[in-house]
């Protein structure tokens, strides 16, 4: 198996231009759109942080953290600590739509 140089990975902005992301909105952290995406991780498990790898784009509905305000506040800092390229949250069912402004503010800081 060969390893791919990170410069070969698409940027988050390029990934978000794919048809599957049509209609998605960047709510915060726009300064990070140049980060390289090495893979995608779809998870809603309570121990999601165990399964994250640097460079991934995490996509979640927030199911496992919806009833835990501390876990919601910790989602983006945890993602940053793990070196993720970004976090995509599908709001509406488990997390409010629109998402809390606190999440956007945190994304902008990170």
Where are these regions (language model features)?
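Alpha-helical/coil-rich non-catalytic "connector" segments in signaling and regulatory proteins
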Residues: 1-110
């Amino acid at each position: 198996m060969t390893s791919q140089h990170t410069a070969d990975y698409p940027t988050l902005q390029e990934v978000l231009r794919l048809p599957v992301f049509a209609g998605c909105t960047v709510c915060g952290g726009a300064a990070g759109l140049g980060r390289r995406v090495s893979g995608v991780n779809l998870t809603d498990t309570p121990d999601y942080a165990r399964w994250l790898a640097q460079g991934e784009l995490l996509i979640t509905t927030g199911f496992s953290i919806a009833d835990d305000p501390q876990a919601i506040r910790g989602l983006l800092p945890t993602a940053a600590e793990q070196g993720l390229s970004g976090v995509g949250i599908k709001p509406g069912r488990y997390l409010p739509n629109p998402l809390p402004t606190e999440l956007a503010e945190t994304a902008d800081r990170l």
